[in-house]
């Protein structure tokens, strides 16, 4: 009777998924044959040596299933039953499960470095570069994007390894597949919307909400510029939007920037008492007829009313993020390549808001409806009035739509030639 002795296994072998002693023909044959007596007799007959049990650490000791097999890989050339698993990012040989997915050492290290250092990359092409063994180092932006899309977890880098059975809301939100309904998906989607905010709300609120803090015209114009920048930065980092064609991104933001600006102004409690002062200064620089002055001041009043009505609802940060996503993903924009897809993204955002409101405000059954009813009114605020009120001193006659296009194409909201604002 053949006697099978389990070989000693170094813990490092489980981590690396390999055998430090290197592949051994006898060990490979024993592993591939499952330790059957018939194959062992054939080995002995072929070698002319009797079978002798080997001790731990002896070269050529038969490996037990679970060393390389636990990582989904085995030594090259073996006829093993273990399946070779590729890196889900680049297709290279996986070294195990890292941050929720099977990846190679290179992609594991790249993802960990990118998350820990909070690195930001820029794609020089169309944000759809091929990521494989030969091209993975050519575009860091697309490589990180693919890491997130296949489900690698940022939280696992920051907090240590997470159990594989734990759901990953970010993976659901970043997958352009069939719509996933359910609280887990929706709450994960909202968390990604919130994470995309470039600045904490308190950064504005701490300055704007202090009653004794008097802000000058220049400060208000700078704050307005920051609100516009934050809208573009937020959109560029939320789920689904970066995957759209750049022409669609430009079309959506050019149509909705003023609505996003009003939402941001309400969210940061922008001091609206200075609006008449801004108007007076603007009218002094560019005189208008009496009729135009009346119309202009009426539009300022509408802007103030919309902001105050939003503030009266005490909208929280998650609700603001959902409202902005509903506004942004509108199929009303001209020239969209796939209007139906944009509309489906708007429905996703609306469902997320409804689920959130029902779970967080169960005693306010009409809250969801009140929030949605505020959105059509945002379009009553004239974008040209916002432009003339807050931005004419900074950018002159350059249209805001042109600035938005340049921001998206340049990959940075703060490196543009029209003005210089320090956003430290």
From Swiss-Prot:
Instruction: Output the InterPro entries linked to this UniProt entry.
Output: NHR-like_dom_sf, Nucl_hrmn_rcpt_lig-bd, Nuclear_hormone_rcpt_NR2, Nuclear_hrmn_rcpt, Znf_hrmn_rcpt, Znf_NHR/GATA
Q: Which terms under GO biological process does the entry name?
A: cell differentiation; negative regulation of transcription by RNA polymerase II; nervous system development
Instruction: Report whether Zinc-finger shows up as a keyword of the record.
Output: yes
What's the superkingdom here?
Eukaryota
Is the keyword NADP in the record? no
Q: Where are the zinc fingers (NR C4-type)?
A: 87-107, 123-147
Q: What keywords appear on the UniProt entry? A: Activator, DNA-binding, Metal-binding, Nucleus, Receptor, Transcription, Transcription regulation, Zinc, Zinc-finger
Lineage here is: Eukaryota, Metazoa, Chordata, Craniata, Vertebrata
| Name of the protein this chain belongs to | COUP transcription factor 1
Q: Which CDD domains match?
A: NR_DBD_COUP_TF, NR_LBD_COUP-TF
- What's the source species for this entry? Bos taurus
Quaternary assembly: Binds DNA as dimer; homodimer and probable heterodimer with NR2F6. Interacts with GTF2B; this interaction is direct. Interacts with COPS2.
């Amino acid at each position: 009777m053949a006697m099978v002795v389990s070989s000693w296994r170094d813990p490092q072998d489980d981590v690396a998924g390999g055998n430090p002693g290197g592949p051994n023909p006898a060990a490979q044959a024993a592993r591939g044959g499952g330790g059957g007596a018939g194959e062992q007799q054939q080995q002995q007959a072929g070698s002319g040596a009797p079978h002798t049990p080997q001790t731990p650490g002896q070269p050529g000791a038969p490996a037990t299933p679970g060393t390389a097999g636990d990582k989904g890989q085995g030594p090259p050339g073996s006829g093993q039953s273990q399946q070779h698993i590729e890196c889900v990012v680049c297709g290279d040989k996986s070294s195990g499960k890292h941050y929720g997915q099977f990846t190679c050492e290179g992609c594991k290290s790249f993802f960990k470095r990118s998350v820990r250092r909070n690195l930001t990359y820029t794609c020089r092409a169309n944000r759809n570069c091929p990521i494989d063994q030969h091209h993975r180092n050519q575009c860091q932006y697309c490589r990180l994007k693919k890491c997130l899309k296949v489900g690698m977890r940022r939280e696992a880098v920051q907090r240590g390894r997470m159990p594989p059975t734990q759901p990953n809301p970010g993976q659901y939100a970043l997958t352009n597949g069939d719509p996933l309904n359910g609280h887990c998906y929706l709450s994960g989607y909202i968390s990604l919307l919130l994470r995309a905010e470039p600045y904490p709300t308190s950064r504005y609120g701490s300055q704007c909400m202090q009653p004794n803090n008097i802000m000058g015209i220049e400060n208000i114009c700078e704050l307005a510029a920051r609100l516009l920048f934050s809208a573009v930065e937020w959109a560029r980092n939320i789920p689904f939007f970066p995957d759209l064609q750049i022409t669609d991104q430009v079309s959506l933001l050019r149509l909705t920037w003023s609505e996003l600006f009003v939402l941001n102004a309400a969210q940061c409690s922008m001091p609206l008492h200075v609006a008449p002062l801004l108007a007076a200064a603007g009218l002094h620089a560019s005189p208008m007829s009496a009729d135009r002055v009346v119309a202009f001041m009426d539009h300022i009043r509408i802007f103030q009313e919309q902001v105050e009505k939003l503030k009266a609802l005490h909208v929280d940060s998650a609700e603001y993020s959902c409202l902005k996503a509903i506004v942004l993903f509108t199929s009303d924009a001209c020239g969209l390549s796939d209007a139906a897809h944009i509309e489906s993204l708007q429905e996703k955002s609306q469902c997320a808001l409804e689920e959130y409101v029902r779970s967080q405000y169960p005693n306010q059954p009409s809250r969801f409806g009140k929030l949605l009813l505020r959105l059509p009114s945002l379009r009553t605020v004239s974008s040209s009035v916002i432009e003339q009120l807050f931005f004419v001193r900074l950018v002159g006659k350059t249209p805001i739509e042109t600035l938005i296009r340049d921001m998206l194409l340049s990959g940075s909201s703060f490196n543009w030639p029209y003005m210089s604002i320090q956003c430290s």
